[in-house]
From Swiss-Prot:
Residues 49-72 bind DNA. This is Transcriptional regulator SlyA. The keyword Transcription regulation applies. GO terms for molecular function: DNA binding; DNA-binding transcription factor activity. It comes from Blochmanniella floridana. Keywords: Activator, DNA-binding, Repressor, Transcription, Transcription regulation. One of its GO terms (biological process) is response to stress. Homodimer. Transcription regulator that can specifically activate or repress expression of target genes. Belongs to the SlyA family. SMART domains: HTH_MARR. NCBIfam families: PRK03573.1. Residues 2-135 form the HTH marR-type domain.
Amino acid sequence: MESSLGSDLARLVRIWRALIDYRLKPLKLTQTHWITLHNIYQLPPDQSQIQLAKAIGIEQPSLVRTLDQLESKGLIVRNICSNDRRAKRITLTELAKPVINQVNQVINVTRNEVFYGLRVEEIQQLNNIIAKLERNIINLYNKT
C-alpha cells in the first residue's frame, strides 16, 4: 500500500503558506518575508547573509532577493563586514520591530485557528512525529 503522506504534507505546507501570504498582504509582506525577519530577530545580532541562509535552510542566492525587498521596505540594513569585505552583516531597523510584532500577531492567530479542534496532546504528538521524520531524513542524508 502506497502512502500519500509526503504529498499530503507538501500540500498542507503549500496551503498554510498561501493562507499566511493572504493574511500578511495588508502589511505588504509574505510568508518568506516573515521567516526571514523572524530568523534575523531570533539570531544573535549582525548575522551574515551566509549564516542567515543556513539558519533558514535556503541557498544564499534565494535569500538575496528577499533581503533586497526587506531593505527596500526599510526593515533591514546590510553593512559590509569589517573582517571580511565580501560578507554583509544584516541588522533590523527600528521600523522593523513594530512590524515584527504585527506579523507575529497575525501568525499566532492563524496558527491558533489552524489548530482549532486539536487537543494540546495531539499537537505535541504531531510535533514529535515531525521531529522523528526530520531526524530520519537527516540521517539518510548523512549516510550518502
